[in-house]
Amino acid sequence: MKILIAVGSKEYSGPTLQVGIKVAKAFNASTTIVDVGEKVSEFSTKVVGLTQERMESWDFDRPGVDVLEWAFKYLAENNFIEPQQIEAGFPKTTLVEKDGRRAEVYLKGTVCDDVNLILRNGDIIAELRDEVQTEFYDVMIIGGSGKRRMVHDMIQYIDSSIFVVKNYDPSQEYQIL
């Protein structure tokens, strides 16, 4: 089973990540955590590429890497990744670019073999739909956004089972989890 956990920020995605990890552990599922950043204009793609190269030489992180680093720390605190990787720290230097819109970090999991952190850029719905279609996820776990329209659009346009985490209280016991 393959699970995609969509996070958007450190401030609001904690419950989504917590539930996603619990579900992944329960099913021993291959897990991917994705953050979709703002869309980069076609006119500025080359400039953004040059800027990212320059940022690397200056030791700046590209937008969204902080969210992936936060997810990595959460995975480490919950022993979801191998101890050797935890000791080495977040591997931002091994962020693999797959096209102009997708970068990925591969991790070795303790509960399952594959744990990936993905950073995509573009329209949230289109990028998540593309990720689900190309990687064949069985379940996508998303947070209950304050924007009802966005959750509705995801459910309508993404061809995957969708688990919506809304009003999750980590101190409460849930029968399903």
Regions found by a protein language model. Name each.
Residues K73-M140:
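Structural beta-alpha unit
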Residues S57, D61-F72, G100:
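Short, surface-exposed alpha-helical segments at coil->helix boundaries
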Residues A29, D113, S160-S161:
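A structural micro-motif
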Residues L17, L117-Y174:
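Gly/Ser-rich helix-loop-strand patches that form or flank binding pockets
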